[in-house]
UniProtKB/Swiss-Prot annotation:
It is found in: Secreted. GO terms for cellular component: extracellular region; host cell postsynaptic membrane. This is Alpha-conotoxin Lt28.1. It comes from the Eukaryota. Residues 22-40 form a propeptide. Belongs to the conotoxin D superfamily. Alpha-conotoxins act on postsynaptic membranes, they bind to the nicotinic acetylcholine receptors (nAChR) and thus inhibit them. This toxin weakly inhibits alpha-9-alpha-10/CHRNA9-CHRNA10 nAChRs (IC(50)=3 uM). Its main location: secreted. Disulfide bonds join C61-C74, C66-C84, C67-C79, C72-C81. Expressed by the venom duct. GO terms for molecular function: acetylcholine receptor inhibitor activity; toxin activity.
Length: 85
């Protein structure tokens, strides 16, 4: 096989091996982007988010989100947050 044909064959096969090794790209998830945007808006002033992660009962924020200290209400037995926007 001539060098040019061999080089073209390698160039065709190489990307296939790379895709197989890495796997397909993860599906786009708008919810993750919304959570990340919400955190950038509301969580930047909190250095340790751990105490505030359980603060919000909203599904959008639960586990991944947090409340800013000034809007988090911990006066009752559990902390609560206003609804996520």
């Amino acid at each position: 096989m001539p060098k040019l044909e061999m080089m073209l064959l390698v160039l065709l096969i190489l990307p296939l091996c790379y895709i197989d090794a890495v796997g397909p790209p993860p599906p786009w998830n708008m919810e993750d982007e919304i959570i990340e945007h919400w955190q950038k808006l509301h969580c930047h002033e909190i250095s340790d988010l751990t105490p505030w992660i359980l603060c919000s009962p909203e599904p959008l924020c639960g586990g991944k989100g947090c409340c800013a200290q000034e809007v988090c209400d911990c006066s009752g037995p559990a902390c609560t947050c206003p609804p996520c926007l």
